[in-house]
């Protein structure tokens, strides 16, 4: 039986408990092929007994002895700390890097008093781990000269902008749910990469 995984996440196999039985959670995860009590047995096959249906007159309950696969979709990408832009020179350097390397950069325009901005920053650092060729920066609008803020044409926060070839290309204004913002940022990067 083929097993299709949408991403490099961890799969583990475990035996389904008998009806009404409590089973403690597994201590560790393992891949389908190795480890755990299900090593070497194919997924979705009966694990007990010989052929057909067990003994005469006995009926197997659904899930009894069945091997089940569970996927754990936690994020395995390592967060990358975003670099701070605190002057016009650093902004120009970041844009120059984008032009020289023909790669987009992401700039998170935020403020220290903005709760949504603070909440999104570690999530953006996780996304930075997913896109190794793209550099991620942040600008605290209260700590930089107004010329930097005007250059980004910032009116709302958090604003996450994608710059490519030294020019503004796209932006996401993060006033809605964090997971939606992160999905929009991923789409924006994939579109302009």
Swiss-Prot record:
Signal peptide limits: none
UniProt xrefs under InterPro entries: Thioredoxin-like_sf (IPR036249), Thioredoxin_domain (IPR013766), WCRKC1/2 (IPR044253)
Location of the Thioredoxin domain: 17-193
Entry's Gene Ontology cellular component terms: chloroplast stroma
Active site: 114 (nucleophile), 117 (nucleophile)
Keyword tags: Disulfide bond, Electron transport, Redox-active center, Transport
PROSITE patterns listed in its UniProt record: THIOREDOXIN_2
Pfam family, one: Thioredoxin
Disulfide bonds: 114-117
Family per similarity comment: Belongs to the thioredoxin family.
PANTHER family on file: THIOREDOXIN-LIKE 3-1, CHLOROPLASTIC, THIOREDOXIN-LIKE 3-2, CHLOROPLASTIC
Described purpose of this protein according to its UniProt entry: Probable thiol-disulfide oxidoreductase that may participate in various redox reactions.
Name of the protein this chain belongs to: Thioredoxin-like 3-1, chloroplastic
